[in-house]
Amino acid sequence: MSVATAALARTPFTGNATTGELTHWRAVATEVAQSLAVDALERDRKNEQPHAEAQLLRSSGLLDLLVPAEFGGAGGHFETAFEAIRILANADGSIAQLLAYHYFNQTGIAFYAPAKQQGAWWERTVAHGWLWGDSVNPVDPTLLLTVEADGYRLNGAKRFSTGSGVGEVIIVNALVQGGENDGKVLAFVLPTDREGLELVDDWDYLGQRLSASNSVRYSNVRVDAAEILGEVTEEPVSTLLIPGLQLAFANFYLGIAEGALARGKQLLLGRKNAWFLSTAPTYSRDVIFQRTLGELKARTAAVAALVEKLGRAYDLLIAKAGDVTAEERAELAVAIAEAKIVSTETGVEVANRIFEVTGTSSTSNDVGLDLYWRNVRTHSLHDPVDYKKIEVGQYFLHGEAQPISLYT
């Protein structure tokens, strides 16, 4: 029952997205976003588990975008997935988060499982239409796996388990006690209806209300040996999962900023008069408001250029699989940390300052402009951006990377 720790010989991801691939999935994501936009505010206020939204993602094909074509998926690239996340965030940051976490939970197959075992996992996720949640929050006490015949028993609890409320399966990390894997952290997959696994519907926060990020409790949950993906190690290619997830964050912060700008523009153009001290005929013709929007738009465009570049770079490095070096991994992780910094600050600033051009009337509860700020403000606290700044500064000054963790 020992878990192999050999380097991954390959990943199923190769090359970069074609123009055709990007065009197709942009159209799919845009259609989904338009559907989400219709009642985003109403759904946010209800604060219910997003089962209908999960089904929308499933029926659109977005859940299987990254599954290799040889196993029944779309055979897409991370660059395309990042863009889909960004487009959805224009309309609904919660569902963009749900999709982002799904992608990196699902592709844990490639990051953790031995190559010869990956095909069966990919085929199962397609056949059953799985949405993948997670239960790996590292700031909670460690989950414990206790050895028993042909498997384990899992005990403990995790908060902030994104997607667990609506996912068919969740990926879990836990520390093994006893046996030949004693002291190892294993990644494994559990169905959310497993006996002893309790989904606690306690996600009631300022924003990202529909990300299904509730708590999960485990009471002597059976974990079969066949449900183990592999060991969580510091092998360079397997540890690229976390920078990839951080880049997904940058994309949905960017998408929220773009959504706030679009909604702000709509509201500003709808204002028919002007401030009484202005000589402009309308608010939208007032250079003060034009200047503010110009500044916010330019900053958002700069973030977009950076994350698009990094999406392509991520695909290229993932394709090297076991040949990825620690130095290459560190360089890309720091570049993604830079994107995390500017996307966080730009997203929060845009979602906040958009009110400067839309006026008091835009704070009405039925307008819902606050949804963008509440969403980006909530998730941008996931890990302190100041530590990302330190990570970048340390690498720039000394060429020293931060220790590998579930945040770096």
Specify the residue positions occupied by each region the protein language model found.
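Glycine-rich phosphate/pyrophosphate-binding beta-alpha loops
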Residues: 159-164, 245-249, 382
